A protein has these predicted regions:
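Conserved, mostly hydrophobic/aromatic
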Residues: 14-16, 44, 52, 67, ...
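Structured C-terminal cap/extension of enzyme domains
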Residues: 45, 50, 69, 168, ...
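Alpha-helix-loop-beta-strand connector modules within alpha/beta enzyme cores
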Residues: 64-83, 136-146, 197
Length: 327
């Protein structure tokens, strides 16, 4: 597994995103299939993946606890935990709630420190909440206490908002949504440039846009397969992101062993995109964008809907129909 350096620490180019573990039905609810998910984590660890990204609310709050249990068999200093303070859940809470959540996260993860701690899902409104709660001072205080090693932000908004935040607070790293579709569609290019200009390492989420860039439609996929028959469609998305020198690690929410093995193959002995590869990818993107898909990653941050609409499910069905033409 390729590594990139962060403050003299080797960080795996592939990071394990712990929001999309395999699940199974249990008492009418979808719960993490712990046996299958642990196999994935064990395989990733054995292959050199050392960055594990979770959050307070992932898998209905089950992700952190499962991750802590699954990783306790390994030396704590051999891997990094990344988790997040859920700013978006704290609109009506006071500062004391941050302490409760942080203590709960340490307990769930079975650790006395968190390597990478982020303010979660911050947009323009969340930025105001951060200021009101004193959340930035809180995470820096935890860093001073030795309970957090590095502080960052998980960002969801425009480059203009990101620039305002970076002008206000200093972060050790920043996590953004970046992939070859959002490079222009959501101006991830400018967000990345802002970080590069300031020398801030970039952690990437949604490199395959919730799985949409792992399949594309048959015409766009055919362009990529013709150019590199041995490579998966998803590998093009991972290589696009990994070709950016300011990227520290690429988070992928791997649900199956095939997905994990494909990413391991792509990012072990990584080969950057050539000029010819970029031309091929641009052709495929042009074909794919003509389909008129809805740019939804399936993150579920829009839920719950006040009138009960299953928004991500409906978007997913629409996109599948649009891409496959109901074949």
């Amino acid at each position: 597994m390729d590594k990139r350096m962060f403050q003299n620490k080797p960080v795996s180019l592939l990071g394990y995103g712990c929001m999309r573990f395999p699940t199974r039905e249990e008492n009418g609810e979808r719960r993490i299939d712990r046996a299958e998910a642990e196999k994935l984590l064990d395989c990733a660890y054995a292959a050199g993946v050392n960055y594990y990204d979770t959050a307070y609310g992932y898998h209905g709050g089950e992700s952190e606890q499962f991750l802590g249990e699954a990783m306790k068999k390994y030396p704590r200093e051999s891997f990094y935990f990344a988790t997040k303070l859920p700013i978006w859940m704290m609109q009506d809470d006071g500062p004391e709630r941050m302490e409760e959540i942080f203590s709960d996260q340490l307990r769930r993860l079975q650790t006395d420190y968190i390597d990478f701690y982020l303010l979660h899902g911050v947009d323009a409104d969340g930025f105001e909440t951060v200021k009101r709660l004193g959340a930035y001072d809180f995470i820096r205080q935890k860093q001073a206490e030795g309970k957090v090693r590095h502080v960052g932000i998980s960002f969801h908004d425009t480059p203009e908002v990101l620039e305002k935040i970076l002008d206000t607070y200093a972060f050790d790293f920043v996590q953004i949504q970046l992939n070859y579709l959002d490079w222009t569609m959501q101006n991830a290019k400018r967000q990345y440039e802002l970080l590069e200009e300031r020398g801030i390492p970039c952690v990437v989420m949604e490199p395959v846009r919730g799985g949409a860039l792992a399949s594309l439609d048959k015409d766009a996929a055919a362009v990529l397969k013709q150019a590199r028959p041995q490579d998966s469609v998803a590998s093009w998305a991972m290589r696009f992101v990994a070709s950016l020198p300011g990227v520290l690690t690429i988070l992928s929410g791997m649900t199956t062993m095939d997905q994990l093995q494909d990413n391991l193959c792509t990012l072990s002995g990584f080969s950057p995109l050539s000029d010819a590869d970029r031309d091929t990818l641009e052709t495929a993107i042009g074909i794919f964008r003509k389909n008129g898909i809805i740019p939804c990653t399936g993150c579920w941050y829009c839920m719950d809907c006040p009138v009960g609409v299953q928004i991500p499910d409906n978007f997913s069905r629409y996109n599948i129909y649009t891409v496959t033409k109901d074949e």
